[in-house]
């Protein structure tokens, strides 16, 4: 039994020594060593933190959950933001995560609610997702409205637009609302990468054009499909 007591005393002695060192490091270690050690630990921590942060900013990470992979990602694939003649693709974080560091951290903190939803299966089935689609869309519309569609403008600049290459009504709308600052991208361009929810009662960002006045307003009567039909007719004019 004596060797057990000796082992315990030896372990306890090392624990108390370590505690004295970390509680009063300057009494045991030089200032230079502490400074260098603190710098190295800081670099390791910062590098690890940013590496983990960037891993969560990838399309692979976003679609690792079946809720995103089987719903919104499938809707993104047929759109021009996923595949186009120039080969420029907008991934999930390009549109849904701010690029500025401070805003990015704030968004990551907000994502804790999404982790909670994952754990408790808030949108674990297609039916649950469809029930929450409008609520989820409204949250994202409000976020983009608040930051003046910052993620859109990371790629699209009003000053770089060639109005001569746009459809007939687009330059008028952009000049009237976008260039003047009266509206922002998300006011008009909802549902560009994912299917729209039921849009009944949700006003569009644009005004009814004079040539359509007196006709049925698509966004008040037919939901998402009617809005898509209306946009299709606009593109052909």
From Swiss-Prot:
Chain residues that bind heme 1: 62, 65, 68, 114
PROSITE patterns reported for this sequence: MULTIHEME_CYTC
Subcellular location: Cell inner membrane
GO molecular function, one term: metal ion binding
Description of post-translational modifications: Binds 4 heme groups per subunit.
InterPro entries assigned: Cytochrome_c-type_ET (IPR051174), Multihaem_cyt_sf (IPR036280), NapC/NirT/NrfH (IPR024717), NapC/NirT_cyt_c_N (IPR005126), NapC/NirT_cytc_sf (IPR038266), NO3Rdtase_cyt_c_NapC/NirT (IPR011885)
Stated name of the protein: Cytochrome c-type protein NapC
Organism: Paracoccus pantotrophus (Thiosphaera pantotropha)
């Amino acid at each position: 039994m004596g060797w057990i007591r000796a082992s315990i005393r030896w372990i306890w002695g090392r624990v108390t020594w370590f505690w004295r060192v970390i509680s009063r490091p300057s009494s045991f270690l030089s200032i230079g060593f502490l400074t260098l050690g603190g710098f190295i630990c800081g670099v390791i921590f910062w590098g690890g933190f940013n590496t983990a942060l960037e891993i969560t900013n990838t399309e692979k990470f976003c679609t690792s959950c079946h809720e995103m992979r089987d719903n919104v990602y499938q809707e993104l694939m047929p759109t021009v933001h996923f595949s186009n003649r120039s080969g420029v693709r907008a991934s999930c974080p390009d549109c849904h995560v701010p690029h500025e560091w401070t805003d990015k951290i704030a968004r990551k903190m907000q994502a804790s609610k999404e982790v909670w939803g994952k754990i408790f299966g808030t949108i674990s089935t297609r039916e649950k997702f469809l029930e929450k689609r409008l609520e989820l869309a409204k949250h994202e519309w409000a976020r983009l409205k608040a930051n003046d569609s910052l993620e859109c403008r990371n790629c699209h600049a009003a000053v770089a637009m060639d109005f001569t290459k746009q459809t007939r009504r687009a330059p008028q709308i952009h000049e009237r609302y976008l260039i003047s600052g009266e509206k922002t991208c998300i006011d008009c361009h909802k549902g560009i990468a994912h299917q729209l929810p039921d849009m009944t009662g949700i006003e569009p960002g644009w005004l009814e054009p004079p040539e359509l006045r007196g006709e049925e307003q698509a966004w008040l009567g037919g939901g998402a499909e009617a809005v898509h039909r209306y946009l299709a007719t606009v593109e052909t004019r």
